Amino acid sequence: MEKFRVHGPFTLSGTVDISGAKNAALPILFAAVLATEPVTLTNVPDLKDVDTTFKILRKLGVVVERDESGAVQIDASKIDHYVAPYELVKTMRASIWALAPLVARFHEGQVSLPGGCTIGARPVDMHISSLEKMGALIELDEGYVKATSNGRLHGARIYMDKVSVGATLSVMMAATLAEGTTTIENAAREPEIVDTALFLNAMGAKISGAGTDTITIEGVERLTGCQHRIVADRIETGTFLVAAAVSGGKITCRGTKADTLEAVIEKLREAGMEVTVTEDTITLDSKGQRPKAVNIRTMPHPGFPTDMQAQFTLLNVVAEGTSRITETIFENRFMHIPELNRMGAKGEIEGNTAICHGVEKLKSAEVMATDLRASISLVLAGCIASGETIVDRIYHIDRGYEHIEDKLRGIGAKIERFSTKFEE
């Protein structure tokens, strides 16, 4: 079992190159299944979840190669297998995205019910019901979702009862090769959906309205090859901005876009931080000041992202004042608070709200990561706590943060990865 040993307290300052967004790379990799010709993707992050996706694609018969520059070539022209198996899918919920492209192009697909982070219910029901409205026949059998269609799927009006990034992406992929026009109402508006639509359109799809709550897709008969650069990771960007805010530092995030992160930047400014933006950089300068407490309510984009909630929990537990953080997207997403409390934080959980009473300093402790974003908040807590903090279960971090130790060391953190042969 791998762990991080983090020494503190240190001020985190410097420049960080932001990686491609995991939450765009994964759906785009699965969407490449729709193309009859090879596609080339650049800015694909080097992550566990990306590797798992490569393995799933290869299991389907897709040729996947990453060259020395990091570019990924995907050739789905010779797919000969239509099942995404349990042993791969169990580690990653995003694997449900294999289903829509398979049934859209080959009229059949099977995906094991997925795994991933343990942050409450993330049902696949909306993916399934939307495909059924487009003419797919769905069976749930022995832990697998099996989808078939009699010829091409057909366009439909799909109203999302709840704003869902995953289901919006599934429908968008399926609709590209459907007969007729599909309209998604109450669609998710995340930048990663916009990026996936840009990729699909580069392959010849006809998608309009991505980034708004109504997306229209006119089906085409086939999709062809293209080149596409994955959008920068706004959550990684936000994470490093928070690192500067909580440590009294100044960090510039390079190769990123401020317009994908407006709610987060607004809250950082409200916390008393100076944030300056250019076309492709965002800089946070704390001026050595302690942040002020800010209330947070997670919402679908363009609201405050749930994937930044844990980082702002850390900010609030070391801020001046008391704050309330309300989580409206996922259940059970405050598992980092008891761990932060072990480090001297004063956080309470009341249902879907956390109340944070700011303290001046954290102290080191042994803590355990519970999901991807919680884990990075514990690592940053270790960077600003006095003494040596051990963070366990860091495999969560490797799912979503590329070369995290190198990037943290580059801004002044003292962090090392080590292995224990067995769990005590």
Swiss-Prot record:
Binding site for phosphoenolpyruvate: 22-23
Main location: cytoplasm
Keyword Cytoplasm annotated: yes
Keyword Cytoplasm in record: yes
Residues binding UDP-N-acetyl-alpha-D-glucosamine, per UniProt: 93, 162-165, 307, 329
A single GO cellular-component term on record: cytoplasm
Role description: Cell wall formation. Adds enolpyruvyl to UDP-N-acetylglucosamine.
Family affiliation: Belongs to the EPSP synthase family. MurA subfamily.
Protein name per Swiss-Prot or TrEMBL: UDP-N-acetylglucosamine 1-carboxyvinyltransferase
Organism of this sequence: Actinobacillus pleuropneumoniae serotype 7 (strain AP76)
Taxon lineage: Bacteria, Pseudomonadati, Pseudomonadota, Gammaproteobacteria, Pasteurellales
